[in-house]
C-alpha cells in the first residue's frame, strides 16, 4: 500500500512539474512580433495581456521555489525573522497594497515596474549559477530559477514596449537597485549561505507578487478605463 501511495505521489509531482513547464512554454511561444516582420506594431491591449500572463507565470514558480527551499533547508533556522525588510529592492519606494498603488500616476508606476525588473537581472543570473553548485539541490529549484530568469528578461522587454506606446519618445534612464549579495551566496558558513538563498527567494516572491498586482491595476486603468 505504501509503495502505491509513493508511486501516486511521485506521478502527481511529475504531472505538476510538467504542467508548470507547459505553461512557461505557452507564454514563451507567444512572439511579440511575427518572425521577419518589419515595423511590427502590437496593440497596447495585447502587450498588457502578454505582460500580465508573464508576471503571473513568474510569481507562481517564485512562490513554489521559495516554499520548496524553505521546507528543505530553512526549517528551525529562524530565517523568516531576519528576512523582513532586507531585500535589495527596498531602496525603491514601492506601494505595499492595491490602495497605495491606486494613488500613483500610471507613468510613475510603469517606471517603477521597469526599475524592479532591472534590479533582478543580476541576482537571477547568479541565483541560477549558484543553485547549480549546491549539493543535492533539487532539479525543480534549478529549473524554476532558469525559467524565471528567462521570463524576467521577456517581461522587461515587454514593459519597455508598453512604456514606448504609452509615452512615445520618453525614454527613462536605466535606474535600478544594485544587488550586492553574491559573496553571501558563496560563503563557506552553511547558515550564512543558506540564509542568503532564503532571503533572495523571499524577496523574489515578494517583488514578483507586487509586479503582478501593479500590472493588473495598470491594465484595468489604461485598457479598461478603470472599469473592472
Curated annotation (Swiss-Prot):
Q: What Gene3D superfamilies does the record point to?
A: 1.20.1250.10
Biological process according to GO: female pregnancy; lactation; positive regulation of cell population proliferation; positive regulation of lactation; positive regulation of receptor signaling pathway via JAK-STAT; response to nutrient levels
For the modification Phosphoserine, the affected residues are 55, 63, 119
State any GO CC term: extracellular space
Transmembrane keyword on record: no
Q: Where is the signal peptide?
A: 1-29
Subcellular compartments: Secreted
GO molecular function terms listed in the Swiss-Prot or TrEMBL record: hormone activity; prolactin receptor binding
User: Keywords, A to Z?
Assistant: Disulfide bond, Hormone, Lactation, Phosphoprotein, Secreted, Signal
Please indicate if the UniProt record lists Hydrolase as a keyword.
no
InterPro entries per record: 4_helix_cytokine-like_core, Somatotropin/Prolactin, Somatotropin_CS
Taken from the UniProt record, the cysteine pairs bridged by disulfide bonds within this chain are 33-40, 87-203, 220-228
Which Pfam family name is an example for this entry? Hormone_1
> What assembly does the database describe for this protein?
Interacts with PRLR.
Q: Which family does it belong to?
A: Belongs to the somatotropin/prolactin family.
User: So what does this one do?
Assistant: Prolactin acts primarily on the mammary gland by promoting lactation, mammogenesis, mitogenesis and osmoregulation.
Supply the name of the protein: Prolactin
Species of origin: Trichosurus vulpecula (Brush-tailed possum)
Classification of source organism: Eukaryota, Metazoa, Chordata, Craniata, Vertebrata
* Gene this chain is encoded by: PRL
Amino acid at each position: 500500500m505504501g509503495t502505491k501511495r509513493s508511486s501516486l505521489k511521485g506521478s502527481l509531482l511529475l504531472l505538476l512539474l510538467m504542467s508548470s513547464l507547459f505553461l512557461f512554454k505557452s507564454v514563451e511561444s507567444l512572439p511579440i512580433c511575427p518572425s521577419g516582420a518589419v515595423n511590427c506594431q502590437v496593440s497596447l491591449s495585447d502587450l498588457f495581456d502578454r505582460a500580465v500572463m508573464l508576471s503571473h507565470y513568474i510569481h507562481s514558480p517564485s512562490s513554489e521555489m521559495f516554499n520548496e527551499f524553505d521546507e528543505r533547508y530553512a526549517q528551525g533556522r529562524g530565517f523568516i525573522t531576519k528576512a523582513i525588510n532586507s531585500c535589495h529592492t527596498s531602496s525603491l519606494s514601492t506601494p505595499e497594497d492595491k490602495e497605495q498603488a491606486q494613488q500613483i500616476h500610471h507613468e510613475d508606476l510603469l517606471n517603477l515596474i521597469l526599475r524592479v525588473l532591472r534590479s533582478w537581472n543580476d541576482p537571477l543570473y547568479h541565483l541560477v549559477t549558484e543553485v547549480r553548485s549546491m549539493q543535492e539541490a533539487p532539479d525543480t529549484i534549478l529549473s524554476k530559477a532558469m525559467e524565471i530568469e528567462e521570463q524576467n528578461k521577456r517581461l522587461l522587454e515587454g514593459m519597455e514596449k508598453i512604456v514606448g506606446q504609452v509615452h512615445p519618445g520618453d525614454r527613462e534612464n536605466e535606474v535600478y537597485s544594485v544587488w550586492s549579495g553574491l559573496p553571501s551566496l558563496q560563503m563557506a558558513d552553511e547558515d550564512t549561505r543558506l540564509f542568503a538563498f532564503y532571503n533572495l527567494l523571499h524577496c523574489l516572491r515578494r517583488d514578483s507578487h507586487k509586479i503582478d498586482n501593479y500590472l493588473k491595476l495598470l491594465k484595468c486603468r489604461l485598457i479598461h478605463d478603470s472599469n473592472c
